[in-house]
Structures are given as C-alpha cells and as structure tokens.
Curated annotation (Swiss-Prot):
Chain location of the short sequence motif 'HIGH' region per the record: 42-52
Protein name: Valine--tRNA ligase
Catalysed reactions listed for this entry: tRNA(Val) + L-valine + ATP = L-valyl-tRNA(Val) + AMP + diphosphate
Gene name of the encoded protein: valS
Positions of ATP binding: K525
Family according to the record: Belongs to the class-I aminoacyl-tRNA synthetase family. ValS type 1 subfamily.
Subunit note: Monomer.
One Pfam family linked to the record: Anticodon_1
Motif 'KMSKS' region: positions: 522-526
Coiled-coil zones: 806-874
Broad enzyme group: ligase
Keyword Protein biosynthesis carried by entry: yes
Subcellular location(s) of the protein: Cytoplasm
C-alpha cells in the first residue's frame, strides 16, 4: 500500500473528520450496553482555551474507547449562553462600534443583536471543537437558550415555586456594580488584600466618654443602626443597653449584646450595618434593628447619606475619614490584611446590598444529592473530591437565582397590575388567574446561567418530553469537568437530576486540574503565558496536541505544560508514521497464515506477550480514567518495545525468504493492527490513516468503529518474555559501555562471556539475535575475564565482557572518565546540599524538590557505574 514519505498532519485532519461525519460515525449504533456523556457546554463568549482543549480531548478518549468496545455511544455537544459574560461582551462591542449603551436599545432590540452575535460565535465554538477531532454527535447539538431547554427551565422553576422551594425575599446579596447584577455566593472570589483598619470614637449619650470601634469600611457607618459587644466580654458588660451617638450623622445607636461579636477583632466593639453586611443583617434580624441602605446599585452613596450623597463609595470613604479627623473622632488607623470579595467575571469589588431577589431553598434538594455520593452511587475521580463535595453540601446555603440582565431565561413570573397577584406559569400568562385582568407585567430579571446548566444532563435529552433518548441515555455515564466548578455546576446537576428524574445524572465524575505553564504559574493575559490550542494544532497537528494533553493529565495534580512537549509528541507521530512505512514496505509476498507456537521465535513470543499485557493494562486504565498512564504505556510499548526492539530484531528475517519471513510478517501486522486500535482514542487521525493501509481482513470499514483489541491469554509466553528481557538487558549493557567509551553503536566489536552457573544457555540459544541487535563481530565463551575489559552484563549465571584495548586509547579514556567522575562528584555534593537545606525542601516547588531527588539518585548511579568502569580498565 502506498504511504507518503512524510507525516503531514493537516492533510489527514481535513480528510478524516469529513469522512467520519459523512459516514455518521459519531451517531450511536445499537450495541452491547451504552455509554452516554454530555459535553460541559463552552461559553459562547470567545475562543476555546487550553483547559477546554484538555477537557474535550479526555472526553473524546473515553467516547472513542467505549465506541470501539461495542457500546451504543453518544456524546452530546452544546454551548452555554453565558448570561453575564455574553451581555458584558456585547455591551462592550456596541459601545465601541456604535457608541451606544444597552439602555439606548429596547430589550427586544438588544436581544436580537445578542442572538445574532451568539449564533456567529456558536459557529466559532463548533469549528474549534472539530479542530480537536471531537467525535460528538452534531445532530444532537443543544444550546442553553434553545426553545426546548427554555421549556425545561420554566417547568423546573414553576415546580419548585409550587413546592415552596423557590421564594422571593429581601436579603443581603452580592452585588456587582460593574456587571449591574446580583451574584451567587460561589460566584464571588475572595482574595487577601492589604487595607486599613480605622479606629473611630463613638460618643456615649449624656457623658464625656466614648467607645472606640474598628472598621475596614468607614463609609458604611452612615447606615449604622447599633453597636454590638459579645455578652461574655467583661470589658463592656456595663455598656450593654447604653446609647452611643453616630459620629457625623448624630443618630442614636443602642449598644446590644450578641454572641457573633469576635472579642479579638479591633476593640471588641463592632458597628452594625444591617443593610450592608450579611453578618450584620443576621444580627439585625435577631435584635429587630432598622435597615438603612446608604449605597446604591452604582456603588454610590444614596440620598440617605446626607452631604455624601452621589459620591463613589471609595471617595466617600476618604471624605468621611477626613471629617472624622477634623472632629477629633479618628483615634488611629492601622495596616490590615483582610479578605475582599470580587466578581468572578470582571474582578470588581462586590457590594453587599439589601435587595428583593429570587432564591432556591437548597437544604431539601441537597439531602438526596448527599446520599448518592456518600453511598458511592456517584464516584469521584480523584476520590478526594468526594470529601470536598460533601463538606460543601453539608453547609449549603440558599441560592440567589435572579440576575439583573436581559440576556438569559427570563423569570416566568407575571405580576398583576390590578390585584397584585403573582402569576407563575410555564406558558406566557395573558390574563391574571385570580382577577382575570390582562394588565400584567413580567418580572424583569433573568435566571442565573447555572440554573439552566444544572438541567443539562436531562434537558439535552429532551426533558420534559419523555423522549427515546431520555429513556435510553439517562443517566449519563461520565462527566468530565474542571474541579473549579464542582459547586457551580456538578453539585447542582446532581440535585436537579435527583429531584426531577428521580435518579443521579451520571455515574462517574472526573475532575481535572488547571493547566498551568511549565513553571506552575496560572495562564493569564498579563503574563503572556497562555497557550492557544488552535495555534499549537496549526503548528504540530491535532494528534500530537491530543497525546501531549493526555500524557500530562495525571489525576489530582495541576498540569504543567511546556510547549516543548508538543514537539516531543510530534516526534512520536513521526515515529509511528515511519514504522508504518517500514512495515508496509516489507509486506511483499505477504499471505495471511495461522501462527503456530512452534513457528514463533523468541522475539515473536515476547512482542505478542507484551502486546497482550499492554492491551490489558491500557483497558484497565481507561476504565478508571487514568488517561496519562494509558498514554505513557502506549508510548512506551510502541516506541521502545515494538519499534526499538521487535522491529530491529526482525529486520534480518524480513529480508529472508520462505516461511520465517511469512511468520514475522503476520506477527508484525497483528501487532501493528492492535497498536493502531489502542492508539485511536488518543491519536485518531494518524491511526485511521495508517490502519486503512494495512493489508489485513478488517472488521469495519473505518477504524473509528472497529473493535477494541481483546486480551488473548493464548498469546502470553512467560518464559519467552523472561528470556528476551535478559537478551534486552545484555544488549543494553553492551550499548551502554559503547556509549560511555565513545565507541559508535554501529561499530562491530568482539564480546566474551563467562558461564558462572551451568543452568542457563540463553546466550548460546540467542547468539545470532544478540550479535544482530548489539552490532557484534562475535560473542564467544571464555574461562577468564579478558584484561582491560568492561563488564557489560552480570546475572546469577553469566558475565559478559567487552575487551576494550582494540577499540580505545586506554590512557585517554582513563583521563576522560576521571574528569567525568569529578564533575559528577560536584553535582552530587550540590544536590545533597540542597536537599539538606530545610528551607529548600519545605518552601520550594514540590516538583523542583522531587526533580532534585531524582537527579541525585541518577548522578549517584552514574558515578558508581563510571567508577567501576575506570577500575576495570586501569
């Protein structure tokens, strides 16, 4: 079969994805069991990043593996409407291109523009997913704002509302002044920041005394309605029930006792601002305190702020501090590091505000979702995430689901303007169900994007309709996602699946880590260290990029990505291509024949044994999502065992004529066929292209739907594996001595061996093979070790020597080895010094410490080897 001289990845990519689609290869076919999976829908706001690429590649490995295992396999793609993010991007675009703000459009006009934008970017996302060779069923593609998904969202909302699990109330919520919307607690990112702690004097009524209060936010004092102390704090027991005067404002404040107060914070006396702090809000509820809002939705002081009205919160802070100083009411200020909440989208500092919002009661929904994980009905990979999930679920709080946006699922609630009745319905309400009035106004807010995403595993399958897909493919088998959305998404899907389907949404959850740069830094625009998957695909090819990500995807560890790794696995693809060329060029006069044990040579039995062991190990790894281990084993088998050993061992036989050539042709084709099948989930393009060229009987027109190789116990030869391993070790020993002595590997040398115990004749039996692999003139027996020879191999029965006098200048080599030993000695000293430094071991990057330990062990081994070699030739 004709095969090009060079591996050209993009030619294969353009050819095979199209052919797979034309052949409906991605659609489920009846099979033995099923495997279903839904893609975590990428946001439509831009390009897929390297973390998305990792996520898609890992899913595709499992999908292709299960498809080849004969299961009815479906992978449902889709995109997320990404409420806040999309609206933010479209608003920026309109401001830049049209010079207009959202408010310059009607809601309908803005939504039409956003839909056009969304459809354009959904297409971009599709092309990027295709570029990764993802075998998703495009005929089942969904979007979180599809009409069908909107029906699902409305049905869930109405159902939860009717059960009293969705309610509306005025509570302290997280407000983002930039995005102009509420955020759920888990959408707020906290970071430790340096700030100030201001100590303010609050005068006591009818006395010359005052009490000092410490605060990080003096601007909120305008909304203070009490001071509080801990009831057990002896310092302030006499103040409980007294009245203080609010500086600048003059409002009277009761001094109350509440166990929430931390006696170690500041002075032990705290200001209570129930409208601007969630903890103060709770204190306010317990003590029936007035709630005075003084900051508006633009983060400016409102009309309740007196002379500070209209000022930005931070400007107001400066002015208030100045005024406190003028009045002699600022005792001191201190540097203070504290946790500050930021919007996860735009990084603006969150403002806690008292607002009327919609919430979901989570405790009742969490009960079953806790139980299925406790009972291991849902398994987490790595397992440690089970504990993280459960700890969060035990402490779950109600979820604020309303967002002050236009883009999203509008809340299905209509307020009657005549009688005030709240109409909640799946269908649009035309008249009030209570009074019949047609004067209705729909709630302006939309639902949190995660609300629709929480329904993804069953809404994508057609729910609330009872579709065939829903019956067949729910629950799904696997969810692959980033650990950072375990609470945003994973937990909520489990809760909603249990609630509305009466069953978990998936069996297994695989959580991958962040992709960082090679130094372990988070990828970011500011550092300029991001890796664009499309750029590296363009440079190296899809298959090498996929294989690189697979190898790096160790469970439970952040992925450190060195761009050089892509080049390493591009070389692997070249190796596969060149090996295939060699095999196909040596298929002249090939005939399929039944392989009999008596016809097989030791190297044949060894490679068949190694192949079957590899099939077994890789299959086990893929069953438990050890993608990296499966990829590494596959790499090692193909490059080291098949190419470097078996193909090398077989070359003379392939150049022969007769039965032995036919045997080796059949063995090599059998092994190559299975190897390409094993390779397919990781490197689909090159494996499909090369498999098509193999002159074998095929069980399928396309490799994508061919059978996964099965473990065959009759092709396991333990004795042959043991003996050939000794041959490999002996040959490697000879190669190592040649390398250390600067003797070219292809230079033929004489080798001697001495029998130590008479029970092993593996050298004599495999003499020709050893001479061929090690480039030897001859390997012959000796009674004594030759002078000035290096020991290449030792075991319990034999010693192998290379007499070096004929091949090297002994004196020159002694000098060279002495210098190398001196260098190694210094390296060992340096590594030991580093590892005995407690500071280095405890504070350095763990990977750096581990690498230093490995370098030390390697250097010590090398030192011992060279020392022995020097001794032998001296």
């Amino acid at each position: 079969m004709d095969i090009g001289k060079r591996y050209m990845p993009h030619e294969l990519e353009n050819k095979w994805y199209k052919l797979w689609e034309e052949n409906h290869s991605f659609e489920p076919k009846p099979g033995n069991g099923k495997f279903s999976i839904v893609i975590p829908p990428p946001n439509i706001t831009g390009r897929i990043h390297i973390g998305h690429a990792l996520n898609i590649v890992l899913q595709d490995i499992s999908v292709r593996y299960n498809r080849m295992k004969g299961k009815e396999t479906v992978w449902i793609p889709g995109e997320d409407h990404a409420g806040i993010a999309t609206q933010h991007v479209v608003e920026k675009y309109l401001l830049k291109e049209e010079g207009k703000r959202r408010e310059d459009y009607t809601r309908e006009e803005f939504l039409k523009i956003t839909w056009d934008w969304a459809n354009k970017y959904r297409n971009h996302i599709r092309e990027q997913i295709k570029a990764l060779a993802a075998s998703v069923d495009w005929s089942r593609e969904r979007f979180t704002l599809d009409e069908g998904l909107n029906q699902a969202v409305r049905k869930v909302f109405v159902s939860l509302y009717n059960e009293g699990l969705i309610y509306k109330g005025k509570y302290i919520v997280n407000w983002c002044p930039s995005c102009g919307t509420v955020l759920a607690d888990d959408e707020v990112e906290h970071s430790e920041e340096k700030g100030k702690l201001w100590y303010i004097k609050y005068p006591l009524e009818n006395t010359q005394n005052y009490v000092t209060v410490a605060t990080t936010r003096p601007e909120t004092m305008l909304g203070d309605t009490a001071l509080a102390v801990n009831p057990s704090d002896e310092r302030y027991k006499n103040l409980i029930g007294e009245t203080a005067i609010l500086p600048i404002v003059g409002r009277k404040l009761k001094i109350i006792a509440d166990p929430y107060v931390d006696t170690n914070f500041g002075t032990g006396v705290v200001k209570v601002t129930p409208a601007h702090d969630p903890n103060d809000y709770q204190i306010g509820l317990r003590h029936d305190l007035e709630r005075i809002q003084i900051i508006d939705e633009n983060a400016r002081i409102n009309e309740n702020g007196g002379k500070y009205a209209g000022l930005d919160r931070y400007i107001a802070r400066e002015r208030i501090v100045e005024d406190l100083k003028k009045e002699g009411l600022l005792e001191k200020e201190e540097d203070y590091t504290h946790s500050v909440g930021h919007c996860y989208r735009c990084d603006t500092v969150i403002e806690p505000l008292l607002l009327d919002q919609w919430f979901v009661k989570m405790k009742p929904l969490a009960e079953k979702a806790i139980q299925v994980v406790e009972n291991d009905e849902i398994k987490f990979y790595p397992e440690r995430w089970k504990k993280v999930y459960l700890n969060w679920m035990y402490e779950i709080r109600d979820w604020c689901i309303s967002r002050q946006l236009w883009w999203g699922h509008r809340i299905p609630v209509w307020y009657c303007q005549n009688c005030g009745h709240v109409n909640v319905s799946v269908e649009d309400v035309k008249k009030c169900e209570k009074c019949g009035s047609t004067d209705l106004k729909q709630d302006e807010d939309v639902l949190d994007t995660w609300f629709s995403s929480a329904l993804w595993p069953f809404s994508t399958l057609g729910w609330p309709e009872e579709t065939e897909d829903l019956k067949k493919y729910y629950p799904t088998d696997l969810l692959v996602t980033g650990f950072d959305i375990i609470f945003f998404w994973v937990a909520r899907m489990i809760m909603m699946g249990e609630k509305f389907m009466g069953e978990k949404p998936f069996h297994d959850v695989y959580l991958h880590q962040l992709v960082r740069d090679k130094y372990g830094r988070k990828m970011s625009k500011s550092l300029g260290n991001g890796v664009d998957p499309l750029e590296v695909i363009n440079e190296y090819g899809t298959d090498p990029v996929r294989f690189t990500l697979s190898v790096l995807a160790a469970q439970g560890r952040d992925i450190k990505l060195d761009v050089g790794s892509f080049d390493a696995y591009r070389k692997f693809a070249n190796k596969i291509w060149n090996a295939a060329r060699f095999v196909l060029l040596n298929m002249e006069d090939y005939e399929k024949t039944v392989l009999k044990d008596e016809d097989l040579k030791i190297e044949d039995k060894w490679i068949l044994t190694r192949l079957n062991s590899t099939i077994l190990e890789i299959s086990k790894d893929l069953e438990v999502y050890n993608y990296d281990q499966a990829a590494r084993k596959l790499y090692d088998f193909f490059w080291n065992e098949l190419c470097d050993w078996y193909i090398e061992a077989s070359k003379n036989r392939l150049n022969s004529i007769g039965k032995d050539k036919l045997v080796v042709q059949n063995v090599i084709l059998q092994v190559f066929d299975s190897s390409l099948r094993l390779l397919h989930p990781f490197m689909p393009y090159i494996s499909e292209e090369l498999w098509q060229k193999l002159p074998i009987e095929k069980d399928s027109e396309l490799l994508i739907s061919a059978k996964w190789p099965e473990y065959n116990e009759s092709n396991i030869y333990p004795e042959a594996e043991k003996v050939f391993s000794k041959v490999m070790e002996l040959v490697s020993g000879i190669r190592n001595v040649k390398a250390e002595m600067d003797i070219p590997q292809t230079q033929e040398v004489d080798v001697k061996y001495k029998i130590v115990a008479k029970n092993d004749d593996f050298i004599e039996k495999n003499k020709n093979l050893i001479e061929h692999l090690a480039f030897l003139i001859n390997i012959t027996q000796t009674e004594v070790k030759p002078a000035k020879s290096a020991t290449a191999y030792v075991d319990e029965s034999v010693e192998v020597y290379i007499p070096l006098g004929d091949y090297i200048d002994i004196d020159t080599e002694k000098q060279r080895l002495t210098k190398k030993l001196e260098k190694l000695s210094k390296d060992i000293e340096l590594y030991n010094k580093k590892l005995s430094n407690k500071n280095f071991v405890e504070k350095a990057d763990p990977d750096v410490v581990e690498k230093t330990k490995e370098d030390l062990i390697e250097s010590e081994k090398k030192y011992q080897k060279l020392q022995a070699l020097l001794k032998e030739i001296s």
